[in-house]
Design a protein with these regions (language model features):
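FIC/Doc superfamily catalytic core
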Residues: 1-250
Length: 250
């Protein structure tokens, strides 16, 4: 991977990490960079992280992998961590490494719902047995997302339209940005997973943008502004998201 592309990927991973509320340390940057430059593998660095942080696989299979531990809001996880703040830090760190791994790969997949589920499944596979699974509970966070009963049918409508739009290839920049904002808003409203929706969707649309002949300068994206734009898009107002993308789509 060329040095300019490596830095673009680092900027993307840093954005995700900081959007989760964490500082992207020099050590974390070096770990991601070593994967992008193919000096280390994600498997090696994840195993090292697990050992250095004294984590142990203590998972006992449950009937509902999408459930939370009793009297907590913490998802069932391979390390049986029940303290949500601790789990979120582990999740963010390991997801960064899997994201770096996926960014080194060429995407031969169709940009469909199965691929979005694959991204989520790989990104969080080291933490959650439920990675890649569609949520079965109602979700709300400043707005109400798609009811779980309708996720599959709504996804079929969204991705069918994306397919008919040729995955946004061959468009001029203005039309591309408008269409990208629309589909980003639709997936945000779909919110198909119990957790990790934003990171999975961002990687999906980042790769789709590159595939369509564009790029995104993540170093210029303000996480709070993007969040507000995403919420507006869920409600059918795409202008804030279009304004954000106008500044960062290359």
């Amino acid at each position: 991977m060329k040095s300019g592309r490596v830095q673009a990927c680092i900027d993307y991973i840093r954005f995700n990490h900081e959007a989760e509320g964490y500082e992207f340390s020099e050590e974390e940057e070096q770990s991601a960079r070593s994967i992008l430059e193919e000096e280390s593998t994600a498997d090696e660095l994840i195993q090292r992280y697990i050992e250095e942080h004294g984590l142990a696989m203590q998972y006992t299979k449950t009937s509902d992998e999408l459930s939370v531990y009793p009297d907590t809001s913490t998802l069932v996880n391979f390390f049986s961590i029940k303290e949500r703040s601790k789990l979120r830090k582990v999740e963010a760190s390991l997801a960064n490494l899997r994201t770096a791994e996926m960014l080194t790969e060429s995407v031969d997949n169709t940009y469909d719902f199965e691929y979005l589920k694959t991204i989520h499944g790989r990104m969080f596979s080291d933490v959650y047995p439920s990675a890649g699974q569609i949520r079965t509970t109602v979700a709300a966070k400043r707005t109400v997302f798609c009811h779980p009963t309708f996720i599959e049918s709504a996804a079929e409508d969204i991705f069918s339209r994306l397919r008919k739009e040729h995955y946004l290839k061959g468009l001029d920049r203005e039309i591309f940005i408008n269409d990208l904002a629309f589909f980003m808003g639709e997936i945000e409203a779909l919110h198909p997973f119990r957790d990790g929706n934003g990171r999975a969707a961002r990687l999906f649309f980042y790769q789709l943008s590159v595939h369509a002949g564009f790029d995104i300068d993540w170093s210029m994206v303000d996480p709070d502004r993007l969040l507000e734009a995403d919420i507006s898009a869920i409600d059918g107002d795409y202008q804030l998201l279009i304004d954000v993308l106008e500044e960062v789509v290359l």
